[in-house]
Amino acid sequence: MRHALKLLLLSLVLAATVDGLAWAGFDEALKAYQAKDFSTALSEARRAAGAGDPRSSLLLGAMYQAGQGVEADQTQAVSHYETAAKGGVIGAFSKLAQAYSRGAGVARDREKALAYARRAAQLGDLEGTFFLSVILTAEYLGYLDPGGKPDDKKYWQLAGRPLSERGIDTEARDALYWSADKGYPLAMMTMALNMGGSIGDGNRKRMQALIDKMPNNSYPALQNYGRISKHMDTLGDSFTSPQLFFDAQAQQMVAAMLQTCGLRDRKEMDKLPMPKLIATKITKPVSNAVYLPSKVAGYDRAYLIAGDWEEGWTYTGCDKTATVTIKFTADGLGGARIVSEQTMKGR
């Protein structure tokens, strides 16, 4: 009995010693990695991984993936990520999702990529949750043709789905909302761009708040959205997104020129001064509104699927003022289109 007890105690001591060495090895590996001493990081991570620390397997996977201290080997990277995932390291699931999505080191498998991304999201991993949004949007909700151009047929097929068939839409957007709210940089930028191009209550404010949190933002499209949004704020009320506001300008400008300057022929446009937009007003709020459901607090009205509204845009030109009445209808995928000829009231 005493002999058995001694063996048990010895095994516990040895296990604790091995665990301690593994933890120490990982700490040394991480410290060396952060100092860009990849040779030391590699040897320490290998030692710790061999002692059973799954965190070191994650680090090894990252080093093999990037070719840091060792020749890049995507197959080895995936192998280490799998070991880390089996050991319960949260960050490994996102890496595996990305590997299977790209077909890097493994055969491309969309379903496995999605399963790993969902597992990462369930565990609260920011990178994995954001990637869940990416893979759902690109693989299941995308409407680009093989050449990267919009496929109108695919777009309208997606836009015409009933709410009962939009579970993936909600999952994708909620993953984006959550990871952006938690401060994941790529999610913040992606959501800011998304808010700049989609119709929803408070989307411009959300976009601007995200831009303000990214002072070093150098993405041209996002900078343009920011400028357009601030200009819209000076004009009054509008339910349009910065993208829709920009897209509608040319058509409304012609309508305004007809009334303010008496434009009779498009050929005269070059000879006449361009009217200036001086005010916007929502004349009829959104009716028959349908929003994409969300499980993330505060986003239940962030993505308009169906609904109609009307706005009056006031222009000045040729010493006259005219208000152009515009009717919008949601297009089913967060955008909207003009559905009727404009009417103009001049004074």
Q: PLM ranges: what are they?
A:
Residues S164, S218-R347:
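Cysteine-centric segments in proteins
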Residues D174-D181, N203-P220:
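TPR/TPR-like (Sel1-like) alpha-helical repeat modules
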